[in-house]
Every structure is written in C-alpha cells, then in structure tokens.
C-alpha cells in the first residue's frame, strides 16, 4: 500500500478513459478539462470494460501512474455525472 498524506484531494473521472494513455496525456487531460495543475491531487480514471483503473498522482517529488485490474467484478461507474 502506498501511503497517501491527509489533505490530498481525490478526483474521479466520470465515463471511461483510454487506458493506453500515459502520465503526460492524463496530466494534460486534467489541465484541459479541470483547469487544474495535476500536482498534489490524486486522479482516478476508469477503463471502458470497468475492471481497470489508472491512478495519477504527483507526490511532490515526481509523477506516478498506478494501475489496478480486478480479477472479478468491476469498479463503480459514475456515468450519471459529467465526464471530464
């Protein structure tokens, strides 16, 4: 488990994201869609199939991209909200 300091805001992208995208592309999405600097907050992107998420986080030292794939089940979709 990677410790996340208290006070870090977590943003969940609605809809689905192309999971082939890397750190720079996802950071650019955050900048263009939310008009936010991606440094300091944690951003979660869900894949189309629902069993994979990518997590983008800058901890002050550098950008990290984490991936989690479920063996069974799917991550919750927030499709009723506006995608960013």
What do the PLM-derived regions correspond to, one by one?
Residues 1-84:
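Polybasic/polar functional segments that serve as interface/processing modules
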């Amino acid at each position: 488990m990677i410790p996340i300091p208290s006070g870090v805001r977590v943003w969940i992208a609605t809809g689905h994201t192309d999971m082939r995208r890397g750190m720079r592309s996802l950071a650019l999405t955050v900048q263009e869609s939310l008009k936010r600097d991606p440094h300091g907050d944690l951003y979660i992107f869900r894949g189309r199939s629902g069993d994979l998420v990518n997590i983008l986080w800058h901890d002050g030292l550098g950008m990290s991209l984490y991936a989690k794939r479920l063996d069974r089940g799917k991550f919750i979709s927030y499709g009723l909200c506006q995608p960013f």
